C-alpha cells in the first residue's frame, strides 16, 4: 500500500479550497460615476449615455431593468442587499437618463458586476 505524503495531502486541500472560493462573489466598497439607462439599450445600442430621460423612463416603466453605465464602460447591475430581493428600478427611476454618482457595495462574479446602492445622487458640477 502506498502512503501519501503530507505535502501531497496539503496540496490537494489547497486546490480544493481555491476551487471552492472561485464561486464566491467578491465584494468591496465602491463609488461609481455614470449614466442611468435601461439594460437593453446598454447592451444592444452600444451607447455611451442614454438617448434621453424619456427613453430610459419609458423602457423602465415597461419592465426593463435600469443599470448604471460607468465612465469606463462597465455596466453595474443594481441589486438589493437583502433577501427576499426586490427590484431596484424604484430607487433609480428618479435618475433615469441622468449622470449619477452612486456609492455602495460592489459584487463581482462570473464576469458580472453588481452594486448594492447605499447612496445615489445626480452628478452636478459641485460633485464631479
Residues of each region from the PLM?
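OB-fold and OB-like single-stranded nucleic-acid-recognition modules
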Residues: 23-128
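Bacterial N-terminal signal peptides
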Residues: 9-22
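N-terminal secretory signal peptides that target proteins for export/translocation
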Residues: 1-7
Amino acid at each position: 500500500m502506498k502512503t501519501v505524503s503530507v505535502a501531497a495531502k496539503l496540496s490537494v486541500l489547497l486546490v480544493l479550497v481555491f476551487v471552492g472560493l472561485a464561486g464566491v462573489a467578491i465584494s468591496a466598497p465602491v463609488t461609481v460615476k455614470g449614466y442611468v439607462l435601461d439594460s437593453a439599450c446598454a447592451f444592444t445600442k452600444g451607447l455611451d449615455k442614454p438617448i434621453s430621460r424619456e427613453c430610459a423612463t419609458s423602457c423602465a416603466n415597461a419592465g426593463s431593468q435600469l443599470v448604471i453605465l460607468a465612465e469606463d464602460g462597465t455596466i453595474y447591475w443594481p441589486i438589493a442587499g437583502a433577501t427576499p430581493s426586490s427590484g431596484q428600478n424604484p430607487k433609480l427611476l428618479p435618475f433615469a437618463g441622468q449622470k449619477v454618482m452612486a456609492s455602495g457595495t460592489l459584487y463581482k462574479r462570473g464576469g458580472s458586476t453588481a452594486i448594492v446602492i447605499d447612496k445615489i445622487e445626480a452628478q452636478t458640477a459641485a460633485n464631479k
